Protein backbone atom coordinates (compact mmCIF):
# COMPACT_ATOMS: atom_id res chain seq x y z
CA UNK A 1 0.00 0.00 0.00
CA UNK A 2 1.32 3.46 -0.92
CA UNK A 3 1.96 6.09 1.76
CA UNK A 4 -0.87 8.26 0.42
CA UNK A 5 -3.33 5.35 0.70
CA UNK A 6 -2.19 4.62 4.25
CA UNK A 7 -2.67 8.25 5.26
CA UNK A 8 -6.17 8.25 3.73
CA UNK A 9 -7.05 5.25 5.92
CA UNK A 10 -5.35 6.85 8.94
CA UNK A 11 -7.60 9.90 8.56
CA UNK A 12 -10.58 7.68 9.37
CA UNK A 13 -8.96 6.96 12.74
CA UNK A 14 -8.29 10.60 13.67
CA UNK A 15 -11.08 12.77 12.18
CA UNK A 16 -14.12 13.19 14.48
CA UNK A 17 -17.40 11.90 13.05
CA UNK A 18 -20.45 14.09 12.38
CA UNK A 19 -22.06 13.18 15.71
CA UNK A 20 -18.99 14.29 17.68
CA UNK A 21 -18.77 17.55 15.71
CA UNK A 22 -22.50 18.22 16.28
CA UNK A 23 -22.10 17.55 20.00
CA UNK A 24 -19.22 20.01 20.15
CA UNK A 25 -21.13 22.73 18.29
CA UNK A 26 -24.17 22.39 20.57
CA UNK A 27 -22.00 22.62 23.70
CA UNK A 28 -20.15 25.63 22.25
CA UNK A 29 -23.39 27.47 21.44
CA UNK A 30 -24.78 26.84 24.91
CA UNK A 31 -21.54 27.91 26.56
CA UNK A 32 -21.42 31.12 24.50
CA UNK A 33 -25.03 31.88 25.45
CA UNK A 34 -24.30 31.47 29.17
CA UNK A 35 -21.11 33.55 29.00
CA UNK A 36 -22.82 36.31 26.99
CA UNK A 37 -25.60 36.49 29.59
CA UNK A 38 -22.95 37.23 32.21
CA UNK A 39 -21.39 39.94 30.05
CA UNK A 40 -17.97 38.30 30.17
CA UNK A 41 -15.16 38.80 27.66
CA UNK A 42 -13.82 35.45 26.54
CA UNK A 43 -12.06 33.57 23.76
CA UNK A 44 -12.27 29.93 22.65
CA UNK A 45 -8.78 28.50 22.23
CA UNK A 46 -7.02 25.17 21.79
CA UNK A 47 -7.66 22.23 19.50
CA UNK A 48 -11.45 22.59 19.51
CA UNK A 49 -11.33 26.26 18.51
CA UNK A 50 -8.90 25.48 15.68
CA UNK A 51 -10.65 22.24 14.64
CA UNK A 52 -7.57 20.07 15.25
CA UNK A 53 -8.85 17.81 18.04
CA UNK A 54 -8.48 14.07 17.70
CA UNK A 55 -11.44 11.78 17.22
CA UNK A 56 -12.77 10.81 20.64
CA UNK A 57 -10.88 13.60 22.45
CA UNK A 58 -13.43 16.40 22.31
CA UNK A 59 -12.78 19.04 24.95
CA UNK A 60 -13.50 22.77 24.83
CA UNK A 61 -11.11 25.37 26.26
CA UNK A 62 -12.46 28.83 26.97
CA UNK A 63 -10.31 31.60 28.42
CA UNK A 64 -11.89 34.44 30.39
CA UNK A 65 -10.16 37.75 29.65
CA UNK A 66 -9.79 40.11 32.61
CA UNK A 67 -8.33 43.64 32.73
CA UNK A 68 -4.69 44.02 33.76
CA UNK A 69 -5.83 46.14 36.71
CA UNK A 70 -7.33 43.04 38.38
CA UNK A 71 -5.23 41.62 41.20
CA UNK A 72 -4.36 37.92 40.99
CA UNK A 73 -6.80 37.32 43.83
CA UNK A 74 -9.63 39.11 41.97
CA UNK A 75 -8.82 37.18 38.79
CA UNK A 76 -8.84 33.88 40.66
CA UNK A 77 -12.12 34.55 42.51
CA UNK A 78 -13.98 35.95 39.50
CA UNK A 79 -12.69 33.18 37.24
CA UNK A 80 -13.88 30.45 39.61
CA UNK A 81 -17.22 32.19 40.12
CA UNK A 82 -17.92 32.40 36.37
CA UNK A 83 -16.65 28.88 35.70
CA UNK A 84 -18.99 27.42 38.31
CA UNK A 85 -21.92 29.44 36.92
CA UNK A 86 -21.62 28.34 33.28
CA UNK A 87 -20.92 24.61 33.72
CA UNK A 88 -23.48 21.86 34.34
CA UNK A 89 -21.13 20.19 36.82
CA UNK A 90 -17.61 21.17 37.83
CA UNK A 91 -14.46 20.59 39.85
CA UNK A 92 -11.63 22.96 40.71
CA UNK A 93 -8.28 22.05 39.18
CA UNK A 94 -4.90 23.63 39.65
CA UNK A 95 -2.19 24.77 37.27
CA UNK A 96 -0.29 28.01 37.87
CA UNK A 97 -3.56 29.23 39.37
CA UNK A 98 -6.95 27.51 39.84
CA UNK A 99 -9.37 26.97 36.97
CA UNK A 100 -12.70 25.20 36.57
CA UNK A 101 -13.11 21.89 34.75
CA UNK A 102 -16.57 20.58 34.06
CA UNK A 103 -19.24 19.59 31.57
CA UNK A 104 -21.68 21.41 29.27
CA UNK A 105 -24.23 19.26 27.41
CA UNK A 106 -22.05 16.17 27.89
CA UNK A 107 -18.84 17.80 26.62
CA UNK A 108 -15.81 18.40 28.86
CA UNK A 109 -14.89 22.06 29.26
CA UNK A 110 -12.03 23.97 30.88
CA UNK A 111 -12.79 27.55 31.95
CA UNK A 112 -9.50 29.35 32.57
CA UNK A 113 -9.06 32.95 33.77
CA UNK A 114 -6.25 35.05 32.29
CA UNK A 115 -5.27 38.66 31.72
CA UNK A 116 -6.23 40.51 28.53
CA UNK A 117 -2.88 41.82 27.36
CA UNK A 118 -1.77 43.84 24.34
CA UNK A 119 1.67 42.24 24.10
CA UNK A 120 2.83 38.72 25.06
CA UNK A 121 5.95 40.20 26.65
CA UNK A 122 3.70 41.52 29.44
CA UNK A 123 2.44 38.11 30.58
CA UNK A 124 1.92 37.61 34.29
CA UNK A 125 1.49 33.82 34.16
CA UNK A 126 1.94 31.05 31.57
CA UNK A 127 -1.77 30.91 30.66
CA UNK A 128 -1.67 34.54 29.50
CA UNK A 129 0.29 33.34 26.44
CA UNK A 130 -2.45 31.00 25.25
CA UNK A 131 -4.70 33.63 23.57
CA UNK A 132 -1.60 34.86 21.69
CA UNK A 133 -0.81 31.27 20.63
CA UNK A 134 -4.37 30.93 19.32
CA UNK A 135 -4.21 34.23 17.45
CA UNK A 136 -0.87 33.31 15.83
CA UNK A 137 -2.03 29.85 14.75
CA UNK A 138 -5.64 30.56 13.79
CA UNK A 139 -5.03 31.72 10.22
CA UNK A 140 -1.86 29.72 9.59
CA UNK A 141 -3.35 26.32 10.45
CA UNK A 142 -6.41 26.76 8.18
CA UNK A 143 -6.53 24.00 5.58
CA UNK A 144 -3.99 21.88 7.48
CA UNK A 145 -6.25 20.70 10.32
CA UNK A 146 -6.21 17.05 9.27
CA UNK A 147 -2.43 17.10 8.87
CA UNK A 148 -2.27 18.10 12.55
CA UNK A 149 -4.63 15.25 13.39
CA UNK A 150 -2.41 12.75 11.57
CA UNK A 151 0.61 13.90 13.56
CA UNK A 152 -1.27 13.80 16.86
CA UNK A 153 -2.68 10.36 16.04
CA UNK A 154 0.76 9.04 15.10
CA UNK A 155 2.21 10.32 18.39
CA UNK A 156 -0.70 9.15 20.54
CA UNK A 157 -0.67 5.63 19.09
CA UNK A 158 2.98 5.39 20.09
CA UNK A 159 2.60 6.81 23.60
CA UNK A 160 4.39 10.14 23.10
CA UNK A 161 1.53 12.63 22.74
CA UNK A 162 1.03 15.03 25.63
CA UNK A 163 3.38 17.44 27.38
CA UNK A 164 2.28 16.51 30.91
CA UNK A 165 5.06 15.08 33.08
CA UNK A 166 3.54 11.60 33.06
CA UNK A 167 4.19 11.45 29.29
CA UNK A 168 6.79 14.15 28.55
CA UNK A 169 5.87 14.00 24.89
CA UNK A 170 4.67 16.43 22.21
CA UNK A 171 2.05 19.03 23.18
CA UNK A 172 -0.84 19.86 20.86
CA UNK A 173 0.61 23.34 20.33
CA UNK A 174 3.97 21.84 19.33
CA UNK A 175 2.22 19.55 16.81
CA UNK A 176 0.46 22.51 15.21
CA UNK A 177 3.67 24.54 14.98
CA UNK A 178 5.44 21.63 13.27
CA UNK A 179 2.66 21.35 10.69
CA UNK A 180 2.77 25.11 10.06
CA UNK A 181 6.55 24.88 9.64
CA UNK A 182 6.77 21.76 7.45
CA UNK A 183 3.38 22.03 5.73
CA UNK A 184 2.13 18.46 6.20
CA UNK A 185 2.39 15.32 8.31
CA UNK A 186 4.50 13.55 5.68
CA UNK A 187 6.98 16.42 5.36
CA UNK A 188 7.27 16.59 9.16
CA UNK A 189 8.07 12.88 9.34
CA UNK A 190 10.55 13.05 6.46
CA UNK A 191 12.44 15.94 8.04
CA UNK A 192 12.28 14.62 11.61
CA UNK A 193 14.44 11.64 10.56
CA UNK A 194 17.40 14.06 10.58
CA UNK A 195 16.63 15.80 13.87
CA UNK A 196 19.26 15.61 16.59
CA UNK A 197 19.33 16.56 20.25
CA UNK A 198 20.70 19.97 19.14
CA UNK A 199 18.18 20.80 16.41
CA UNK A 200 16.58 24.25 16.69
CA UNK A 201 13.37 24.92 14.73
CA UNK A 202 12.49 28.59 14.45
CA UNK A 203 8.92 28.58 13.15
CA UNK A 204 8.53 32.36 12.80
CA UNK A 205 11.83 32.77 10.91
CA UNK A 206 11.29 29.60 8.87
CA UNK A 207 14.72 28.14 9.61
CA UNK A 208 16.39 25.11 11.17
CA UNK A 209 19.74 25.55 12.89
CA UNK A 210 22.00 23.93 15.46
CA UNK A 211 21.88 24.90 19.13
CA UNK A 212 22.60 23.57 22.61
CA UNK A 213 19.43 21.45 22.89
CA UNK A 214 16.34 20.45 20.93
CA UNK A 215 14.50 23.76 20.81
CA UNK A 216 11.31 24.80 19.02
CA UNK A 217 11.12 28.58 19.24
CA UNK A 218 7.74 29.90 20.34
CA UNK A 219 6.68 32.45 17.69
CA UNK A 220 4.93 34.38 20.46
CA UNK A 221 7.96 34.43 22.79
CA UNK A 222 11.32 33.73 21.15
CA UNK A 223 12.99 32.89 24.48
CA UNK A 224 10.54 30.07 25.18
CA UNK A 225 11.14 26.48 24.08
CA UNK A 226 7.82 24.90 23.10
CA UNK A 227 9.52 21.48 23.32
CA UNK A 228 10.89 22.07 26.84
CA UNK A 229 8.76 19.27 28.34
CA UNK A 230 9.72 16.77 25.62
CA UNK A 231 12.15 14.24 27.09
CA UNK A 232 15.31 13.34 25.18
CA UNK A 233 14.22 9.69 25.09
CA UNK A 234 10.83 10.56 23.56
CA UNK A 235 12.56 12.78 20.99
CA UNK A 236 14.75 9.78 20.11
CA UNK A 237 11.68 7.50 19.92
CA UNK A 238 9.93 9.89 17.54
CA UNK A 239 12.96 10.17 15.25
CA UNK A 240 13.22 6.36 15.16
CA UNK A 241 9.48 5.98 14.46
CA UNK A 242 9.76 8.44 11.57
CA UNK A 243 12.65 6.45 10.08
CA UNK A 244 10.71 3.21 10.45
CA UNK A 245 7.55 4.70 8.94
CA UNK A 246 9.35 6.02 5.87
CA UNK A 247 11.15 2.68 5.37
CA UNK A 248 8.02 0.55 5.73
CA UNK A 249 4.83 2.66 6.03
CA UNK A 250 1.76 0.94 7.47
CA UNK A 251 -1.50 1.76 9.21
CA UNK A 252 -0.14 0.06 12.33
CA UNK A 253 1.75 3.24 13.20
CA UNK A 254 -1.62 4.92 13.85
CA UNK A 255 -3.12 2.14 15.96
CA UNK A 256 -2.64 2.20 19.76
CA UNK A 257 -0.06 -0.21 21.14
CA UNK A 258 -1.43 -2.23 24.02
CA UNK A 259 0.98 -2.76 26.93
CA UNK A 260 2.32 -6.30 27.13
CA UNK A 261 0.56 -8.21 29.92
CA UNK A 262 1.81 -11.71 30.69
CA UNK A 263 1.04 -14.39 33.24
CA UNK A 264 2.96 -14.33 36.56
CA UNK A 265 4.39 -17.77 35.80
CA UNK A 266 5.95 -16.62 32.53
CA UNK A 267 7.31 -13.53 34.25
CA UNK A 268 8.84 -15.70 36.96
CA UNK A 269 10.58 -17.84 34.33
CA UNK A 270 11.93 -14.76 32.52
CA UNK A 271 13.43 -13.36 35.73
CA UNK A 272 14.86 -16.81 36.54
CA UNK A 273 16.50 -17.02 33.10
CA UNK A 274 17.97 -13.54 33.49
CA UNK A 275 19.41 -14.42 36.89
CA UNK A 276 18.79 -10.94 38.25
CA UNK A 277 17.22 -9.38 41.32
CA UNK A 278 13.88 -7.81 40.39
CA UNK A 279 11.95 -6.00 43.11
CA UNK A 280 9.79 -2.98 43.90
CA UNK A 281 9.35 -0.38 46.60
CA UNK A 282 5.58 -0.18 47.20
CA UNK A 283 4.00 2.72 49.09
CA UNK A 284 0.73 4.64 49.29
CA UNK A 285 0.07 7.12 46.49
CA UNK A 286 0.29 10.72 47.76
CA UNK A 287 -2.85 12.80 47.24
CA UNK A 288 -1.34 15.25 44.73
CA UNK A 289 -1.86 16.01 41.03
CA UNK A 290 0.05 13.96 38.46
CA UNK A 291 2.27 16.87 37.40
CA UNK A 292 3.59 17.01 40.97
CA UNK A 293 3.63 13.25 41.54
CA UNK A 294 5.55 12.07 38.48
CA UNK A 295 8.62 14.32 38.87
CA UNK A 296 8.89 13.03 42.45
CA UNK A 297 8.57 9.39 41.34
CA UNK A 298 11.30 10.03 38.78
CA UNK A 299 13.52 11.62 41.44
CA UNK A 300 12.95 8.78 43.94
CA UNK A 301 13.68 6.19 41.26
CA UNK A 302 16.89 7.99 40.24
CA UNK A 303 18.11 8.41 43.83
CA UNK A 304 17.63 4.72 44.64
CA UNK A 305 19.22 3.69 41.32
CA UNK A 306 22.30 5.81 42.16
CA UNK A 307 22.43 4.23 45.62
CA UNK A 308 22.39 0.74 44.07
CA UNK A 309 25.25 1.78 41.78
CA UNK A 310 27.31 3.10 44.70
CA UNK A 311 26.78 -0.14 46.61
CA UNK A 312 27.95 -2.21 43.59
CA UNK A 313 24.65 -4.03 42.97
CA UNK A 314 24.97 -3.07 39.28
CA UNK A 315 21.39 -1.95 38.53
CA UNK A 316 20.30 -2.52 34.93
CA UNK A 317 17.17 -0.39 34.66
CA UNK A 318 14.42 1.14 36.75
CA UNK A 319 10.78 2.13 36.21
CA UNK A 320 7.84 3.47 38.19
CA UNK A 321 4.07 3.15 38.23
CA UNK A 322 1.22 4.93 39.99
CA UNK A 323 -2.06 3.04 40.39
CA UNK A 324 -5.22 4.32 42.08
CA UNK A 325 -3.99 3.52 45.59
CA UNK A 326 -0.27 2.68 45.44
CA UNK A 327 2.97 3.71 43.78
CA UNK A 328 5.74 1.32 42.74
CA UNK A 329 9.45 1.97 42.16
CA UNK A 330 10.78 -0.97 40.12
CA UNK A 331 14.40 -2.11 39.85
CA UNK A 332 16.45 -4.86 38.24
CA UNK A 333 20.00 -5.52 39.48
CA UNK A 334 22.69 -7.80 38.06
CA UNK A 335 23.93 -8.68 41.56
CA UNK A 336 21.44 -10.70 43.61
CA UNK A 337 23.79 -11.15 46.55
CA UNK A 338 27.23 -9.73 47.24
CA UNK A 339 29.90 -10.83 49.73
CA UNK A 340 29.75 -9.41 53.24
CA UNK A 341 33.41 -8.34 53.03
CA UNK A 342 34.85 -5.73 50.67
CA UNK A 343 38.17 -3.88 50.34
CA UNK A 344 38.43 -0.18 51.10
CA UNK A 345 41.18 1.92 49.56
CA UNK A 346 43.41 3.82 51.96
CA UNK A 347 46.21 6.40 51.55
CA UNK A 348 49.59 5.87 49.85
CA UNK A 349 52.35 4.85 52.27
CA UNK A 350 54.10 8.28 52.08
CA UNK A 351 51.06 10.04 53.59
CA UNK A 352 52.05 9.46 57.23
CA UNK A 353 49.26 11.43 58.89
CA UNK A 354 46.43 9.77 56.93
CA UNK A 355 48.06 6.32 57.16
CA UNK A 356 48.03 6.65 60.95
CA UNK A 357 44.39 7.69 60.89
CA UNK A 358 43.46 4.84 58.49
CA UNK A 359 45.21 2.19 60.61
CA UNK A 360 43.72 3.44 63.88
CA UNK A 361 40.23 2.25 62.98
CA UNK A 362 39.08 -0.93 64.70
CA UNK A 363 38.53 -3.64 62.08
CA UNK A 364 37.92 -7.39 62.12
CA UNK A 365 40.83 -8.04 59.71
CA UNK A 366 44.38 -6.73 59.33
CA UNK A 367 45.02 -3.95 56.77
CA UNK A 368 47.57 -4.66 54.02
CA UNK A 369 49.80 -2.86 51.53
CA UNK A 370 49.40 -3.35 47.78
CA UNK A 371 51.25 -1.34 45.10
CA UNK A 372 52.40 1.19 47.67
CA UNK A 373 48.94 1.90 49.04
CA UNK A 374 47.18 0.78 52.21
CA UNK A 375 43.98 -1.24 51.92
CA UNK A 376 41.59 -2.71 54.47
CA UNK A 377 38.87 -5.35 54.53
CA UNK A 378 35.57 -3.99 55.81
CA UNK A 379 32.11 -5.46 56.32
CA UNK A 380 29.03 -4.39 54.41
CA UNK A 381 25.85 -3.53 56.27
CA UNK A 382 23.78 -5.45 53.71
CA UNK A 383 24.45 -8.07 51.04
CA UNK A 384 21.32 -7.95 48.84
CA UNK A 385 19.90 -4.98 46.90
CA UNK A 386 16.56 -5.45 48.66
CA UNK A 387 18.21 -5.11 52.10
CA UNK A 388 20.12 -2.08 50.89
CA UNK A 389 17.06 -0.29 49.51
CA UNK A 390 15.08 -1.06 52.68
CA UNK A 391 17.83 0.61 54.72
CA UNK A 392 18.21 3.54 52.31
CA UNK A 393 14.47 4.28 52.05
CA UNK A 394 14.14 4.15 55.84
CA UNK A 395 16.94 6.65 56.45
CA UNK A 396 16.93 8.80 53.30
CA UNK A 397 13.17 9.16 52.67
CA UNK A 398 13.56 12.97 52.86
CA UNK A 399 15.68 12.94 49.65
CA UNK A 400 13.02 11.15 47.58
CA UNK A 401 10.68 14.08 46.90
CA UNK A 402 8.51 16.01 49.35
CA UNK A 403 5.25 14.03 49.13
CA UNK A 404 6.71 10.72 47.95
CA UNK A 405 9.30 10.85 50.73
CA UNK A 406 6.64 11.51 53.38
CA UNK A 407 4.54 8.63 52.06
CA UNK A 408 7.55 6.28 52.16
CA UNK A 409 8.36 7.42 55.70
CA UNK A 410 4.85 6.45 56.82
CA UNK A 411 4.78 3.06 55.08
CA UNK A 412 6.61 1.10 52.43
CA UNK A 413 7.48 -2.50 51.68
CA UNK A 414 9.95 -4.22 49.40
CA UNK A 415 8.24 -6.84 47.26
CA UNK A 416 9.66 -9.40 44.85
CA UNK A 417 8.95 -12.81 43.36
CA UNK A 418 5.38 -14.12 43.22
CA UNK A 419 4.04 -11.24 45.31
CA UNK A 420 5.46 -8.67 42.88
CA UNK A 421 4.21 -10.53 39.81
CA UNK A 422 0.62 -10.36 41.15
CA UNK A 423 0.74 -6.57 41.50
CA UNK A 424 -0.56 -4.35 38.62
CA UNK A 425 2.96 -3.74 37.29
CA UNK A 426 3.48 -6.54 34.77
CA UNK A 427 3.40 -4.14 31.78
CA UNK A 428 6.05 -1.93 33.41
CA UNK A 429 8.21 -4.94 34.31
CA UNK A 430 7.99 -6.23 30.72
CA UNK A 431 8.96 -2.82 29.34
CA UNK A 432 11.82 -2.47 31.84
CA UNK A 433 13.24 -5.88 30.93
CA UNK A 434 12.62 -5.58 27.18
CA UNK A 435 10.30 -8.60 27.07
CA UNK A 436 9.08 -9.36 23.54
CA UNK A 437 5.50 -10.29 22.60
From Swiss-Prot:
Binding, ATP: 47, 50, 133, 152, 161
UniProt signal peptide: none
Catalytic reaction(s) noted: a tRNA precursor + 2 CTP + ATP = a tRNA with a 3' CCA end + 3 diphosphate; a tRNA with a 3' CCA end + 2 CTP + ATP = a tRNA with a 3' CCACCA end + 3 diphosphate
Binding site for CTP: 47, 50, 133, 152, 161
Matches recorded under InterPro entries: CAA_C (IPR048833), CCA-adding_arc (IPR008229), CCA_tRNA_nucleotrans_2 (IPR042090), NT_2-5OAS_ClassI-CCAase (IPR006116), NT_sf (IPR043519), NuclTrfase_I-like_C (IPR011068), Polymerase_NTP_transf_dom (IPR002934), tRNA_NucTransf2 (IPR015329)
A GO biological process held by the record: RNA repair
Alphabetized UniProt keyword annotations: ATP-binding, Magnesium, Metal-binding, Nucleotide-binding, Nucleotidyltransferase, RNA repair, RNA-binding, Transferase, tRNA processing
Function text: Catalyzes the addition and repair of the essential 3'-terminal CCA sequence in tRNAs without using a nucleic acid template. Adds these three nucleotides in the order of C, C, and A to the tRNA nucleotide-73, using CTP and ATP as substrates and producing inorganic pyrophosphate. tRNA 3'-terminal CCA addition is required both for tRNA processing and repair. Also involved in tRNA surveillance by mediating tandem CCA addition to generate a CCACCA at the 3' terminus of unstable tRNAs. While stable tRNAs receive only 3'-terminal CCA, unstable tRNAs are marked with CCACCA and rapidly degraded.
Sequence similarity: Belongs to the tRNA nucleotidyltransferase/poly(A) polymerase family. Archaeal CCA-adding enzyme subfamily.
Misc. remarks from the entry: A single active site specifically recognizes both ATP and CTP and is responsible for their addition. In contrast to the eubacterial homologs, the specificity of the nucleotide-binding pocket is determined by both the enzyme and the tRNA.
Assembly and oligomerization: Homodimer.
Protein's recorded name: CCA-adding enzyme
UniProt source species: Archaeoglobus fulgidus (strain ATCC 49558 / DSM 4304 / JCM 9628 / NBRC 100126 / VC-16)
